[in-house]
């Protein structure tokens, strides 16, 4: 992984950390941030060639993937991300935390749907 990619990850993580840097954050959103931060500390990253992603049988088409640009999609994004945790309480705290997201052009959120169900979520940046 090159420096530019690592810097993009750092910027994304700083942006996510600052979501609850407000005057009166909720106890739940702060707990959600702590849970999310612990996960980041255990996270490892690897570069995946774009061609590897495109060569796989594609489950979603471009028409199935939506830019998160209003609150309901933010909630769906948060719920999908929370499913990375097995503990129900942690999932609830992650939803509370991530629904605080203030949309930014630097980090775009996407939600993918299959047969009317939200099945994928991503944070995308152009580094």
Each predicted region: which residue ranges?
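Conserved beta-hairpin
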Residues: 106-122
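Acyl-donor-binding surface of acyltransferase catalytic domains
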Residues: 1-64
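Short amphipathic alpha-helix that is part of the acyltransferase structural core
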Residues: 12, 42-99
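A conserved beta-turn-beta hairpin within the catalytic core of GNAT-like acetyltransferases
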Residues: 126-127
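Short loop/turn motifs at secondary-structure junctions and domain boundaries
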Residues: 100-105
